[in-house]
Amino acid sequence: MPAKQVAFAEHAREKMLRGVNVLADAVKVTLGPKGRNVVLDKSFGAPTITKDGVSVAKEIELADKFENMGAQMVKEVASQASDEAGDGTTTATVLAQAIIREGLKAVIAGMNPMDLKRGIDKSVIVVVEELKKQSKPCKTQKEVAQVGTISANSDDSIGKIIAEAMEKVGNEGVITVEEGSGLANELDVVEGMQFDRGYLSPYFVNNQDKMVAELENPYILLHDKKISSIRDMLPILEQVAKSSRPLLIVAEDVEGEALATLVVNTMRGIIKVAAVKAPGFGDRRKAMLEDMAILTGGRVVSEEIGMKLESTTLADLGQAKKIVIDKENTTMIDGAGQQSEIKARVEQIRRQMEDASSDYDREKLQERVAKLAGGVAVIKVGAGSEMEMKEKKARVEDALHATRAAVEEGIVPGGGVALVRARHALEGFKTANHDQDMGVAIIRRAIEEPLRQIVANAGGEGSVVLNKVVDGKDGYGYNAATDEYGDMFEMGVIDPTKVTRTALQKASSIAGLMITTEAMVTELPKKDDKSGGDMGDMGGGMGGMGGMGGF
């Protein structure tokens, strides 16, 4: 086990605070509409330019081990705020720095760190309740666009396109962000259920201009195994042929004789058929087939529930208004499933989302909800260069998270005003003792900091603006983008309640732990290791390998 170094009391706190300040000072320059960019060096490729707090925080590693521990703990604040609310990372970092700075001053003055932490925790609960009282529901498309615009650094084109996407696919719909090929942002909406499997044979194509297979009012056969023998399928094919309606087959695979027979019958015009592979793998494939069955009002033909392909009837098949299949995707439009069953399935998947342990599983479950409930919208980000594309894509993703948070928990005045307004809830708030009261005072001072920083980044004087805002009421605040005072809701400067709440809770949680730190332990820095210097002799010895040419 390598030797360790230990720092205690003042020395430990001083080093920790230095690390916190380095990271927070780099992150907080990005706050607000007039926040600056930060350039991040990459080990390969061009540098990345960003205004996203968590991206800056993730890049910072300090040489001094003790300082680095302080920086890493504040990095955790930004990461947690990003994970839970998707935005507010810079606000969380600014709040954490302010709480730690004021808290450590109080510890140095002789206050009890544990009581300070208790006071901080109690006052955060009061402030969060006050934020919830200020919160208004985010209902209109205009409000959604305003939230997106603020989060995307006052880029109203991003706010508008996100609001449009949310209106088209609903709050439950999936909105994905991709790199576009042009200069302008584009919105592509897929209604109905789409999955990433195309036709198994190009001979199924019946629209030669678009190279797609279009099936109007088709039956849909869902099977969870491979189909290789046509004999099993003959009974159901005959029933479908009599009905004169097309058929889509979704199975693990359709191959050999079965595929050849389907192609021949389609080309001769005896029956209009298309076959695609089922999406996903393993248990996820079974779940998605079941989703399709519920959406189309059919059943999955599965031996697990005692059903056989040869005994399938038309009543077991799903139906839809239209199906479009291209080389890579299949889209089912207007399935014939019962709305009550679809709703119940969506609720079931939502419960699974709450229990999901990984982000990947949660994302896949969210996609399934969207395919059942709404649709899928793709925002294609346009930019003039690769560097701009990366920066813009990150902003669109941030804005998307913020708008989802706004729809979920509502909106409060932006620009740091909501936190300043929440201060009055702490006036006269008394705790068990003087040291805990000091913890309350620390939060009262810290929640001014986001407003002060936004003003400082805009080139103003924080204290002057703060006093004017404090004298106002409700949504009255300072719009740093236009350098005007007024009602923040009317000016469209709004923040999601969830983002503001999460930023404060995460910042106070980790700051409280850091204030109560009394010792720090880390490995001793390693001396430069010169063990690679003796390898020069190997060049001569390797020459004998030339004889291997005989092979």
Curated annotation (Swiss-Prot):
The molecular function terms in GO held by this entry are:
ATP binding; ATP-dependent protein folding chaperone; isomerase activity; unfolded protein binding
Biological process (GO) annotations? protein refolding
Give the source's domain of life in one word: Bacteria
This protein's UniProt keywords: ATP-binding, Chaperone, Cytoplasm, Isomerase, Nucleotide-binding
Cytoplasm as a keyword of this entry, yes or no, is yes
Positions bound to ATP? 30-33, 51, 87-91, 415, 479-481, 495
Q: Which reaction does it catalyse?
A: ATP + H2O + a folded polypeptide = ADP + phosphate + an unfolded polypeptide
Against InterPro entries, the record matches this protein to:
Chaperonin_Cpn60_CS (IPR018370), Cpn60/GroEL (IPR001844), Cpn60/GroEL/TCP-1 (IPR002423), GroEL-like_apical_dom_sf (IPR027409), GROEL-like_equatorial_sf (IPR027413), TCP-1-like_intermed_sf (IPR027410)
Please tell me which top-level EC class this enzyme sits in. isomerase
Pfam families assigned:
Cpn60_TCP1 (PF00118)
The EC number(s) this enzyme carries: 5.6.1.7
Q: Which GO terms describe its cellular component?
A: cytoplasm
Record has ATP-binding as a keyword: yes
Mind telling me which Gene3D superfamilies this protein's record contains? Answer: GroEL, GroEL-like equatorial domain, TCP-1-like chaperonin intermediate domain
Q: What is its main location?
A: cytoplasm
Q: Where in the cell is it found?
A: Cytoplasm
Provide the family line: Belongs to the chaperonin (HSP60) family.
Family annotation (PANTHER family): 60 KDA HEAT SHOCK PROTEIN, MITOCHONDRIAL (PTHR45633)
Spell out the subunit comment.
Forms a cylinder of 14 subunits composed of two heptameric rings stacked back-to-back. Interacts with the co-chaperonin GroES.
The entry's function note states:
Together with its co-chaperonin GroES, plays an essential role in assisting protein folding. The GroEL-GroES system forms a nano-cage that allows encapsulation of the non-native substrate proteins and provides a physical environment optimized to promote and accelerate protein folding.
Protein name in UniProt: Chaperonin GroEL
The species this protein was found in: Acidithiobacillus ferrooxidans (strain ATCC 23270 / DSM 14882 / CIP 104768 / NCIMB 8455)
